[in-house]
Amino acid sequence: MVAPSFESPPVRLGIVWYRVPDETPDADGEDVEYLDPSTESGAALRLLDPRLYDGLASVVASGDRSVAALAAAGVLPLDTRTFDDELTFAGQAGRTERAAFRVDWLSRALAELAGCAVVFVDPDGGLRRSDHKRRSWHPKAVKHAYLDELGPFIGRGQSVIASHHTKGSDKVRKQARRLMGDAAEELGVEPLAAVRADRGSTRLFLVLPVDAHRSHLERRLTALTGSPWAAELDVIWRE
């Protein structure tokens, strides 16, 4: 979920990309029709933030759809800090080695994003409870962030916004409520909302504010519900 502004926000943003090795073949990212302003949907999206739209379109058109290219395109707030070390278990034969690598990877992310007020977490597959049957050291767990990995950021006073892919079996609002409940249970922080985005695949953006940022983030989400962005993003408040 890219912030719809090039300006520096009142709070500094950090991003953990959860970058994993490229997979071939992989259909992820093939749906880019929305970045064609000659289409009805593309034209509507561009009106929301022309500079952001054009920046993303230029990255896709260049063929270099990397984290570095995204940063170079200037589509993020000016003082954003990012962590994009690859999360891979290649060469890690056993569970102990994989678990240790993941702990070290998270430690590096924490060090890189020290000083950021809000941290955006962007795993390919979304969020999982820490007691999920496929634990974080599983060879195929790298596409997910586990809720307990968000705890160290929150514990040192950073609010977290985390991207999550919904599943097809349950209604999205039900999934959002369950996700917010899981986060409250595991992290001891009261979620503010989950923001739903339906273009392409449905995603939720879980908003976990620390007390110092709660009122500011609540005002921003309330403003979003009355803005043109409300046609694209649905705020599901915590009940």
PLM regions and their residue ranges:
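Class I S-adenosyl-L-methionine-dependent methyltransferase catalytic core
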Residues: 1-239
